[in-house]
Structures are given as structure tokens and as C-alpha cells.
Amino acid sequence: TPKPSSAASDVYKRQVITIAIITTIVWLLTGHEAGYALARGISVLVISCPCALGLATPVAIMVGNGMGAKNGILFKTAVSLEEAGKVQIVALDKTGTITNGQPEVTDILPADDVSENDLLTLAYALEKKSEHPLAKAILEKAASLGLTAQEVTEFQALPGNGLSAKLGASTLIGGSMKYINTLAAVSPSLMNQAEKLAEAGKTPLLFAKDGKLLGIIAVADVIKPDSAQAVKELQNMGIHVVMLTGDNKRTARAIGAQAGVDQVIAGVLPDGKESVIRSLKEKGKVAMVGDGINDAPALTRADIGIAIGAGTDIAIDAADIVLMKSQLSDVPAAIRMSRATLRNIHENLFWAFFYNIIGIPLAAGVW
């Protein structure tokens, strides 16, 4: 695809050649010698030498690419550097883009007669054999506190509900509010706290021993420190910010509110992001920001694909721009850089054309 700014150069070259030919013919038809007429035509070509015009875009692109690389923003092509500044909508994948992509323990709420360490120790023993992504957060938290996990037996994972196992003669269970509520006595106050955690976009995991609730451990994929500021900067630039996620609406709304996005599209399946981008493109020029394998089709479909540097190779290959620092704040920085480069190109082209508007008539003998 030719660079947008190269179109002006192509038109200019054709027009200059046409003007030179017309100049030569006019001087011949007005009775002047062929040498004089030819000299006028050649003068037009010489004075309109497109050096300034030819350098207007490449120099600005080179400087823009250099500044981008210096700041950890890689523009793969000149087109991506020129087009990023025209973006009207930015679609952000939630996991790994707005959030850290690594669930972590955010709250530990033990029952009245249970300590935090006791709750974590029993949760550690139960979750140690789990392969669920949320289990990793609890294991890391317990390990960071120097806790040790006791060995459990008769371990069972119940997809969509939770876990159960035997610890000596006792039965341990852990999982969702709905699951634990059917097997253990949950106080109204703890249930209320669990609801509030869920409304805040966190996942409350309840743990019980022999039918007695031990407490709640909340796990969440927290947003990056710079996410909210990056979203605000994009909005201040007149850009509509959309968050895409496969989460349920309640969790998605909570994360979206923390980040401050304009629109939340929840329940998006991994293979459904491309169709969402297609529909967004009907409203304006779209940039998609993502980091995962399932983001690659959407990155390709968007007008500008922006990949987080810490993401998968497939996402990076599919993108037009790569943020090497994996910071969301580099998205508005990349767009600002593109706009500054475009502004520089337009200024360079203006002065190049201004010179020729004055010089060509002089060379042609009009003045």
C-alpha cells in the first residue's frame, strides 16, 4: 500500500512535467527560438527539483521512528506512523492490556474466630492440587508469607463450583459463593462482603472446614497502575475508548469503571473480537490493543493493530505498532507521536509547495 503522503509527490511530478512541456510549446508558438523555449522548459524542471518535496516525508518519518524507538514504541511501517494519528476509536482487550494479566490476592477476610494465616494455610492445602488460574494467586500469596501446605487426600475439582478434599479426618471445601452456600453455614455479613467484592470486579472464593465457613479470599486481575491515566489521555485527545472482555457484565462493568472507559463490551468470545472490531469500524477509524493469541485476528482487522510487547509472538506479528515497555500509557504516546509527525510532514510540504508556487512562474517567464 503506498504511503498516503506520497500521493502528493506523484501528482506534483506529473504536473511539473506537464507545465514544462506547456511552457516550451507556448514560447515556440509565440515566435521565440527553439533554444530559448527549451531553456524555459528546462528551467521549470530545474527550479521545481522535488528535493525539498521528496525529503519532506522521509525525514519526518525517520525522526518519528527514531523518537518512537527511543521511547520503546516500534512503528513497523511508515504507513502505521502516519495513520495512527487519525484513529477515532481505541478498543482495549482487558486481560494483559488494561489489567496485569496475572490474578493476585486482593482481600483476605477470615471469620471471627479464624486468623488470616489459618485461612490462607487451609486454602493453600486445598488449592495446591488445583490447576485453575485463580489457584496460582493463592499459592503465590501463601508462599510469599512463608506458609507451608499440608497434604490433602481425596482431592476433587468440580468445574464451575469449586474444590473439595480431606485433611486428616476433616473435609475442606472451597469455591464460589453459590457452591459453598449449599454446603456450609455462611453468615449474612460475610455473604454481604462477598457480594461487594464481586461488584468490585473481584472473584470471592469461600473456604469451609467441616461445614463451618473459615472466610473469604478475593482474587482479581487488577488493572495496571497507568491504565486509568492512559484512558483519560485518550479521551482528552477526542478518542472513544472501548474495553473488550470475555467476563460477565458485572465484573466487566467494575473493571471498566476503574479504568474509566467510555464503553464496555462484555461476554466477547475469543473468536468474536474480530467481528466486534468490524462493527466498530463502521463508526470510525479503529485501533485495537491486545497481547494474546486470540487478539491476532482483531489486530489484523483493525485499521491500526497495537501489540503489548510482553504478549505472544502471534499478536506482535499481527500488529502494526509494538509497545516494547508493555505500558498502556504508550498508546496515547504513540498517537501523539503520529500526530506530531503528520503535522511536521504537512509543514514541510507547505514550504516545499510555497517555494515552487513562486519559483515555477519565474522560471517559465510568466513574471
Task: Map each language-model feature to its residues.
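Hydrophobic transmembrane alpha-helical segments of multi-pass transport and channel proteins
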Residues: 48-55, 129-130, 353-354
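Conserved ATP-binding TGD loop and adjacent catalytic N/P-domain core of P-type ATPases
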Residues: 87, 167-169, 201-203, 209-347
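Single conserved hydrophobic/aromatic residue that forms the stacking wall/gate
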Residues: 1-8, 12
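ATP-driven catalytic headpiece of P-type ATPases
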Residues: 85-92, 98-131, 161-242, 320-321
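Conserved catalytic phosphorylation-site environment of P-type ATPases
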Residues: 39, 52-126, 280, 290, ...
